[in-house]
């Protein structure tokens, strides 16, 4: 739900197939509200062996740069990742990032989207990460809450209304 991933791998039929692994990770306030949370995030990234990591809830608390801190923590664990400064959502890549763009900037904690360009061999890869505005999540309707005011309202129980696919 938090991830918009677009990958352009124009591999010709004569090339060997290339694969990569992506981890999408909502790090819940950078792990700051859980004892040992930051280290647990770093350990899970290492355990996943992901080539690309997309992050939700990057906050840059106390004027720090979360992506710089996590890249350093991963380096201390023997892993090399690259990143760039973001707010709210973030990207890590095992491959050097050649370009990055803010697609949708964070505004009043209403979500964000970023794009990174990297290369796997001669193939350009575009990776997007998004953290959507939490106030308009569909599951609030089924639970009987307005995501903007938190007022109770009758839950939406009509299956046709809740259905994503016809």
Model-derived features: positions:
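N-terminal, active-site-proximal structural segment of metallo-dependent hydrolase catalytic domains
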Residues: 13-76, 86, 150-162
């Amino acid at each position: 739900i938090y991830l918009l991933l677009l990958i352009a791998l124009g591999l010709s039929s004569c090339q060997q197939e290339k694969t990569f692994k992506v981890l999408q990770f909502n790090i819940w306030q950078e792990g700051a509200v859980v004892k040992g949370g930051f280290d647990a995030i770093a350990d899970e990234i290492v355990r996943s062996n992901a080539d690309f990591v997309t992050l939700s809830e990057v906050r840059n608390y106390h004027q720090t740069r979360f992506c710089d801190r996590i890249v350093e923590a991963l380096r201390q664990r023997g892993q090399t990742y690259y990143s760039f400064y973001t707010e709210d959502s973030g990207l890590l890549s095992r491959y050097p990032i050649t370009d990055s763009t803010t697609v949708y900037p964070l505004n009043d904690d209403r979500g964000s989207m970023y794009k990174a360009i990297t290369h796997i061999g001669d193939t350009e890869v575009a990776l997007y990460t998004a953290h959507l505005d939490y106030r308009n999540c569909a599951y609030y309707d089924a639970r009987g809450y307005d995501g903007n005011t938190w007022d109770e309202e009758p839950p939406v129980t009509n299956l046709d209304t809740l259905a994503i696919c016809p």
